[in-house]
Amino acid sequence: MAAVVLPPTAASQREGHTEGGELVNELLKSWLKGLVTFEDVAVEFTQEEWALLDPAQRTLYRDVMLENCRNLASLGNQVDKPRLISQLEQEDKVMTEERGILSGTCPDVENPFKAKGLTPKLHVFRKEQSRNMKMERNHLGATLNECNQCFKVFSTKSSLTRHRKIHTGERPYGCSECGKSYSSRSYLAVHKRIHNGEKPYECNDCGKTFSSRSYLTVHKRIHNGEKPYECSDCGKTFSNSSYLRPHLRIHTGEKPYKCNQCFREFRTQSIFTRHKRVHTGEGHYVCNQCGKAFGTRSSLSSHYSIHTGEYPYECHDCGRTFRRRSNLTQHIRTHTGEKPYTCNECGKSFTNSFSLTIHRRIHNGEKSYECSDCGKSFNVLSSVKKHMRTHTGKKPYECNYCGKSFTSNSYLSVHTRMHNRQM
């Protein structure tokens, strides 16, 4: 006779589920208890370091450390609190009374705080409603401070208040020295150190000092080699997000900084600022052989090699030499076949960003550079300059071997190779 297996009843399913859930919880607690100690997650400050923190940073520290205490206590760990925690608990109580937040022991969860020094007062349910923000604390003590415009969540109410000024544009804290304004008092305090020269944050490795903790954090990556910001196109990494942003423009071809006088475009503001000196005459570096002026000393040094014939950068594959290291880097790609710059329109790839920028003008029909003599237009500044020499007869590039002159450097380079083959 075949055996008949009866399905479990709903009651037995609930009972089994409850017993199984309790067993899993106990196993997890036992496992986590052996892996995590409070020392693993605790952060200690000296009195001097504590004095440097602003109220928002102290609030964040208090919330994080108290939450760590709660979570570890719920696992049954014996927690030895840092010396600041008792002070923070007292501050938490005072802040609760001052803000008028309704507090009470949570009725839904049994008190898990049996560890040394922890009391049921820490496990509370708080709720505060206002016109622009909402704050709730759940059973684990996690804080929800959500911006009602972008829905970004912050760990403290003060952080949310400071964040909302991004949307409103409010900058109530002005510098009395230069008039620059900021959205928070702490940002203004950091800015004022520019005027008074105060640099309280010192690197333990090299002794260099900084006006803000964030600058020190970025600087330390020089010593430890940390580069957390990675380019998704080529994999190159950077120690600072501000370095990654202009690098990404190499791949996209974006050049947001445009000169109003010569219409040249630039990827970064620093290069654009140096370029403007060419027009204003500020900080000019003038070649004493041809009188040509440059915005930086390095550009002038590179230019001198035209007159001296010096090509210090040599390709190990073919022996070809170059005046600039960047030119050698681009040339090496002709051997490796690497073309990291791709056109989004047609998929064509190029060895350098400049070629990609010029190529894109084929798609949009842009020819920004016009000859003032004949009206012919070009999509590259160097092309219109070269073309205008057909009208002026100017030939600024002279061969050091035979004295012959040329309208462009590329023509001179081709001509120079003829002498090199004869030697």
Swiss-Prot record:
ZnF segments: C2H2-type: 145-167, 173-195, 201-223, 229-251, 257-279, 285-307, 313-335, 341-363, 369-391, 397-419
Domain KRAB: 36-107
GO cellular component: nucleus
Keyword Phosphoprotein: no
Annotated keywords: DNA-binding, Metal-binding, Nucleus, Repeat, Transcription, Transcription regulation, Zinc, Zinc-finger
Domain of life: Eukaryota
Protein name, entry field: Zinc finger protein 557
Organism: Homo sapiens (Human)
